[in-house]
C-alpha cells in the first residue's frame, strides 16, 4: 500500500443514491425535481424506454397507448393488462381533478372533469381483470375525495405515475431492452444503498474513535462506543484518510484469528411525517390544466400553490431526458389557452417588438399579464392568471399562513376558512372574467372591421387619388386611436405617419412604386402596393388595376415592425406572404392559379432531379440529381415575370460530375452558406466547403460513412458550443439520425427510435429536430438531451401513412407533414394535438414547406402538381388551396426562396424549375 491512494467517486452515482432513497421513501415530487435539475435518472433504460417513462410521468396517456401499439400485435405482450394499468391511472387522475374542482367550488369545470372520469371508467370496463375490480373503481365515483378510500389514502399523482411506469416497465422490458450504447451510464442504485452507506460511515467513525481511545489510553466502555454518534455533525473524526486501514494492515495475522462474540446491530429509524397540506396541494395543482376542456379555458393553478409545490406534473417534452421541465410547458399552456384553434397559427409569429394580436402573449414566466386590450386597468387577464393581482395576493397569504405559521388551526378548520375566503374571490373573478370576455369580443369585431377595410378600402381604381389618400389618412387616424386604447408604445409612430402621408402624396404625381426590398422589380405601370394593417404594422399604397379584386395578392411577409424607408423611397412590403387573402373558391382554382406564379428558369438534366436548396443569402441554389451531378446555379439578379414569356436556362456557376458514386438524394446549405452537404444512395454524406462569392470549392470534401443505407435527407443547425455547423443526416439502413460537428469532423450522436426508413428531417430553434419515417410517425428530438422527446403518429384517422416530408413554421408551434396517402397533417406542437388532416393532392405528398412568414404552405406531389394552402383562416376547417405549378412527371421537392416570392421544384421529368410570383 502506497503512502497515497486515490478513490474515484462520481457525483452522478451520488445523485443516483439520493434518487434511490427518495424513491424508497415515496418522496417522488422531490425525486422528479432532482432528476429535472441534474439530468440523472436512476436506471438503465433504452431510448425508447426513457421516452415511455417520460410520457407516463407527463401524464400523456393517449400518447402512451399510441406509442405501445406496435407491441400489441405480439402474442407474448399482455395488451389487456397494459391498457388496464394506463387507463386506471388516467381514471384516478381525472377523479383527482374532479375532487379538487369540487373542493374549490367551480361548478362549470366540475361537469367537464366528471365527464372525463366517467369516460375513462367506461373505457376501463373491458380491460378490468374482474367485475369486482370494475365495481371498486365505480365506487370511487361516489367518494368526496379519492384519498378517503383506504386503498388510496396516501395517493398522489407523482407517486402513482412512478409506480405506473415501474409496472409498465416490467411488461415491456422484454421488447424494449436497454441498448449497448447506454451501458456506460452506470448501474442502478438499489437496496437502499444510501442508508447502508450512512450507517457504515457512522460505524467507521465509531471504530476510529475507539481505536484512538485505545492508543491514547483513554477509557471508553463498550456501551459508550455508540453513544457519541452524531449523524449531522460527526464526532470530530472528519479527516478523510487511510490511517485506520493502514493501522489494521500492520497488525499481525494472529490478531484476526482470535475468537470474538458476534453482535447484532439494531437500527431504529424515526419515520418522516409528511405535511398533510403538501400532499393535498400535490393533488390540487398539477393535473387541472391538463384536462382543460378548450384552449381558452382559464383553469390554472393559483400562483400561491407554488408555496406548497413548485413542480408541475405536466411538463413540456422539451428539455431533460426525464421530461420534467416545466418552464416551456407553462409557456405552451398559456399560449394554448389564449388562442382558440380558429385563429391562424401564423398570427402568433410576429418578429416585431410591439404586438397587438390579442392571441399573442408575453412568453415569459416572470410576466403575469398580457397586453391588455382594455383601458380598464383593473380588468384581470384571464389567459395568464385566473384571478386579479389583488385577489391573487390575498389567496397567497391565506394559503401560506396555515402552512408555515406557528398558530395553525386544525386541518378541517383551515380548509373551511380557505373555501369560505375563496368563494367571494371566485365570484368576483367570474364577474370580471365575463366583462373581459365581452370586451375581447368587441375588440375582435373591431379587428374584423379593420381587416375588411384593408381588403376593400384600397383596391378600387375608379376612386380618385384624393379619395384614396383620404381613405388612407382616415384609416391611419383610426389605427392610431386604436393603438392608444390598447396601451401599446407609440414611440416614433408620428414620424412614420408623416412619412406615409408624404408617400401617399408623392404617389399622386407618379405611379412608380417599388414592390420589393430586394431585386424584385416590376415596370412602373404595373407596380403596386397594398394598404395593410396587421397586429403591429401599418402600410399604405395605391391600387394595382381594376381587375385586382379577383387577383390573389401576396402581401408583406412580416406584419410587424415598420418597413419605412427614406423620404425618397416608397413603401416596400418585404417579399413573402402576409395576412393578405389567398382564399378563393374551388372552381376558380384551376382557371386563375397559373397567373399567380410563372416559370422563369428551367434546368434540364439527363435523369430525374431529386434535390434542390437555396443558399441562405438567396443568390444561389444547389441542384442534385440521379445523374450523380451536383450543380450550383445563379438566382436571377432581376425578377421580371413579364420578361420571361419563354423560360430560360439558369446560369450554372459550379458543376461537379460524379460527385457521388450514386444518385444524389438530398442537398443542404449550412446556415452561414459556407458548406454544401449532399447525401446519396452510395451511403456517403459529403460536405463541400464552398465560397459563394467565387462560386468555387474552397477545400477538400469532408466525407462521412456512418450510414449503412441511403441518405434520404440532410439539415444543418448552428453548433451551440463550437459555433460551427452541426449536420443532421438520416435515411434507410439502421434508421438512425446522426449528428456531426463539421468543424471538427467528428460524429456527435446517433439517435435511435424510428423503426422504418427516415424520409425527412427539419430543424428549428437551434436544437430541435423533426423526423418523418416510413414507420408512420414523426419524432421530435432535442439535441440538448439528446433523445426523442415526442412521437406523433399518423393514425388519428385510419391506418396512418408513411411520412415523406416534414416542416415546422418559424414560430415552432405548427408542424406540417406530407404523407404517402396524399394527405397533409397540421399538428399543434405545443398543444400536442392534430389540428387537421386534409388531402390537397391525389398522390404521395413528397414535399411540404412553410413560407417564411408561415401564412402559406407549399406542397409538391407525385400527382405532378405544386399547390399552396392558405393557413390564415380557421385551421380546423377546409383550407383554400390553389395550384401554382405543374410538371410533366412526379414532383419530388419544392423549396421557397429565402426572401422573394419564388420557389424551386424538382421533378422526375428531369427538370428543375424556378417559379416566381406574377405580380
From Swiss-Prot:
Region of interest (Disordered), residue spans: 393-421, 500-590
Domain LisH: from-to ranges: 10-42
Modified residues (Phosphoserine): 289, 292, 297, 312, 422
Subcellular location: Cytoplasm, Cytoskeleton
Keyword Cell membrane: no
Gene3D superfamilies hit by this protein: YVTN repeat-like/Quinoprotein amine dehydrogenase
One biological process term in Gene Ontology: negative regulation of microtubule depolymerization
Biased composition (Polar residues): 517-551
UniProt repeat feature WD, residue ranges: 604-643, 659-698, 706-748, 753-791, 798-837, 840-879, 886-918
Keyword set includes Metal-binding: no
Gene name, Swiss-Prot/TrEMBL: WDR47
SUPFAM superfamilies from the UniProt entry: WD40 repeat-like
Any one cellular-component term (Gene Ontology): dendrite
Name the record gives this protein: WD repeat-containing protein 47
Keywords assigned by UniProt, alphabetized: Cytoplasm, Cytoskeleton, Developmental protein, Microtubule, Phosphoprotein, Repeat, WD repeat
Source lineage: Eukaryota, Metazoa, Chordata, Craniata, Vertebrata
Top-level taxon: Eukaryota
Modification Phosphothreonine occurs at: 285, 542
Quaternary structure annotation from Swiss-Prot or TrEMBL: Interacts with MAP1S (via WD repeats).
Start and end residues of each CTLH domain: 45-102
Source species of the chain: Homo sapiens
Amino acid at each position: 500500500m502506497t503512502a497515497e491512494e486515490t478513490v474515484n467517486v462520481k457525483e452522478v452515482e451520488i445523485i443516483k443514491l439520493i434518487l434511490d432513497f427518495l424513491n424508497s421513501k415515496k418522496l417522488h415530487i422531490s425525486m422528479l425535481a432532482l432528476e429535472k435539475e441534474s439530468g440523472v435518472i436512476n436506471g438503465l433504460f433504452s431510448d425508447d424506454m426513457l421516452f415511455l417513462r417520460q410520457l407516463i410521468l407527463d401524464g400523456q396517456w393517449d400518447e402512451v397507448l399510441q406509442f405501445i401499439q406496435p407491441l400489441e400485435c405480439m402474442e407474448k405482450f399482455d395488451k389487456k393488462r397494459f391498457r388496464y394499468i394506463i387507463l386506471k391511472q388516467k381514471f384516478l387522475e381525472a377523479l383527482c381533478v374532479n375532487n379538487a374542482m369540487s373542493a374549490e367550488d367551480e361548478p362549470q369545470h366540475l361537469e367537464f372533469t366528471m365527464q372525463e372520469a366517467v369516460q375513462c371508467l367506461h373505457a376501463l370496463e373491458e380491460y378490468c381483470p374482474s367485475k369486482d375490480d370494475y365495481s371498486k373503481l365505480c365506487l370511487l365515483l361516489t367518494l368526496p375525495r379519492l384519498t378517503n378510500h383506504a386503498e388510496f389514502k396516501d395517493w398522489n399523482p407523482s407517486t402513482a405515475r412512478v409506480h405506473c411506469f415501474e409496472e409498465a416497465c416490467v411488461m415491456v422490458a422484454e421488447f424494449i431492452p436497454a441498448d449497448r450504447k447506454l451501458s456506460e451510464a452506470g448501474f442502478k442504485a438499489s437496496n437502499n444503498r444510501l442508508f447502508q452507506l450512512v450507517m457504515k460511515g457512522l460505524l467507521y467513525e465509531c471504530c476510529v474513535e475507539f481505536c484512538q481511545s485505545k492508543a491514547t489510553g483513554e477509557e471508553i466502555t463498550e456501551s459508550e462506543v455508540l453513544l457519541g454518534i452524531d449523524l449531522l455533525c460527526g464526532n470530530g473524526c472528519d479527516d478523510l484518510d487511510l490511517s485506520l486501514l493502514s493501522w489494521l494492515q500492520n497488525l499481525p495475522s494472529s490478531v484476526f484469528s482470535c475468537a470474538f462474540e458476534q453482535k447484532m446491530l439494531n437500527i431504529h429509524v424515526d419515520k418522516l411525517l409528511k405535511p398533510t397540506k403538501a400532499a393535498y396541494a400535490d393533488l390540487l395543482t398539477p393535473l387541472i390544466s391538463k384536462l382543460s376542456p378548450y384552449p381558452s379555458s382559464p383553469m390554472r393553478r393559483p400562483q400561491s400553490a407554488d408555496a406548497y409545490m413548485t413542480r408541475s406534473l405536466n411538463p413540456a417534452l422539451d428539455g431533460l431526458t426525464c421530461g420534467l421541465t416545466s418552464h416551456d410547458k407553462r409557456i405552451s399552456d398559456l399560449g394554448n389557452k389564449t388562442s382558440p384553434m380558429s385563429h391562424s397559427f401564423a398570427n402568433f409569429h410576429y418578429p416585431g417588438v410591439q404586438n397587438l394580436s390579442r392571441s399573442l402573449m408575453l412568453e415569459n414566466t416572470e410576466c403575469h399579464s398580457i397586453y391588455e386590450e382594455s383601458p380598464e386597468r383593473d380588468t384581470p387577464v384571464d389567459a395568464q392568471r385566473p384571478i386579479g393581482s389583488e385577489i391573487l395576493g390575498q389567496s397567497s397569504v391565506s394559503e401560506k399562513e396555515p402552512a408555515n405559521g406557528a398558530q395553525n388551526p386544525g386541518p378541517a378548520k383551515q380548509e373551511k376558512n380557505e373555501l369560505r375566503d375563496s368563494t367571494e374571490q371566485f365570484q368576483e373573478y367570474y364577474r370580471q372574467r365575463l366583462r373581459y370576455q365581452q370586451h375581447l369580443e368587441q375588440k375582435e369585431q373591431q379587428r374584423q372591421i379593420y381587416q375588411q377595410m384593408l381588403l376593400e378600402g384600397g383596391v378600387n381604381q375608379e376612386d380618385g387619388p384624393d379619395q384614396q389618400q383620404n381613405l388612407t389618412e382616415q384609416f391611419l387616424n383610426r389605427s392610431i386611436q386604436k393603438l392608444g386604447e390598447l396601451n401599446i408604445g407609440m414611440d416614433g409612430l408620428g414620424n412614420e405617419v408623416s412619412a406615409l402621408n408624404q408617400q401617399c402624396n408623392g404617389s399622386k404625381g407618379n405611379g412608380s412604386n417599388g414592390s420589393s426590398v430586394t431585386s424584385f422589380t416590376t415596370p412602373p405601370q404595373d407596380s403596386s402596393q397594398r394598404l395593410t394593417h396587421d397586429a403591429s404594422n401599418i402600410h399604405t399604397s395605391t391600387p394595382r388595376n381594376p381587375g385586382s379584386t379577383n387577383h390573389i395578392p401576396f402581401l408583406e411577409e412580416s406584419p410587424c415592425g415598420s418597413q419605412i424607408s427614406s423620404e425618397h423611397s416608397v413603401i416596400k412590403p418585404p417579399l413573402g406572404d402576409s395576412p393578405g387573402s389567398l382564399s378563393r373558391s374551388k372552381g376558380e382554382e384551376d382557371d386563375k392559379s397559373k397567373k399567380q406564379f410563372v416559370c422563369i428558369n428551367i434546368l434540364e438534366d439527363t435523369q430525374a432531379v431529386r434535390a434542390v436548396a437555396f443558399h441562405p443569402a438567396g443568390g444561389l441554389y444547389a441542384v442534385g440529381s440521379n445523374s450523380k451531378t451536383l450543380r450550383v446555379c445563379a438566382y436571377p439578379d432581376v425578377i421580371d415575370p413579364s420578361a420571361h414569356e419563354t423560360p430560360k436556362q439558369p446560369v450554372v456557376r459550379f458543376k461537379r460530375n460524379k460527385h457521388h458514386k450514386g444518385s444524389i438524394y438530398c442537398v443542404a446549405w449550412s446556415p452561414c452558406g459556407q458548406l454544401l452537404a449532399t447525401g446519396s444512395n452510395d451511403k456517403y454524406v459529403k460536405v463541400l466547403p464552398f465560397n459563394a462569392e467565387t462560386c468555387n470549392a474552397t477545400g477538400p470534401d469532408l466525407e462521412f460513412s456512418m450510414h449503412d443505407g441511403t441518405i434520404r435527407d440532410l439539415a444543418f443547425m448552428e453548433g451551440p458550443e463550437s459555433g460551427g455547423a452541426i449536420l443532421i443526416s438520416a435515411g434507410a439502413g439502421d434508421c438512425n439520425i446522426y449528428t456531426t460537428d463539421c468543424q471538427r469532423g467528428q460524429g456527435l450522436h446517433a439517435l435511435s427510435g424510428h423503426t422504418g426508413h427516415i424520409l425527412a428531417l427539419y430543424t428549428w430553434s437551434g436544437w430541435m429536430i423533426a423526423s418523418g419515417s416510413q414507420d408512420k410517425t414523426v419524432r421530435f428530438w432535442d439535441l440538448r438531451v439528446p433523445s426523442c422527446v415526442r412521437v406523433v403518429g399518423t393514425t388519428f384517422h385510419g391506418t396512418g401513412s408513411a411520412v415523406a416530408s416534414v416542416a415546422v413554421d418559424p414560430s415552432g408551434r405548427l408542424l406540417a407533414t406530407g404523407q404517402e396517402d396524399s394527405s397533409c397533417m397540421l399538428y399543434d406542437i405545443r398543444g400536442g394535438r392534430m389540428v387537421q388532416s386534409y388531402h390537397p393532392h391525389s398522390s404521395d405528398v413528397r414535399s411540404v414547406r412553410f413560407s417564411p412568414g408561415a401564412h402559406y404552405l407549399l406542397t409538391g406531389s407525385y400527382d405532378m402538381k405544386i399547390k399552396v394552402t392558405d393557413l390564415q383562416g380557421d385551421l380546423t376547417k377546409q383550407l383554400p388551396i390553389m395550384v401554382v405549378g405543374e410538371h410533366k412527371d412526379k414532383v419530388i421537392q419544392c423549396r421557397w426562396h429565402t426572401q422573394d416570392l419564388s420557389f424551386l421544384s424538382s421533378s422526375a421529368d428531369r427538370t428543375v424549375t424556378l417559379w416566381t410570383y406574377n405580380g
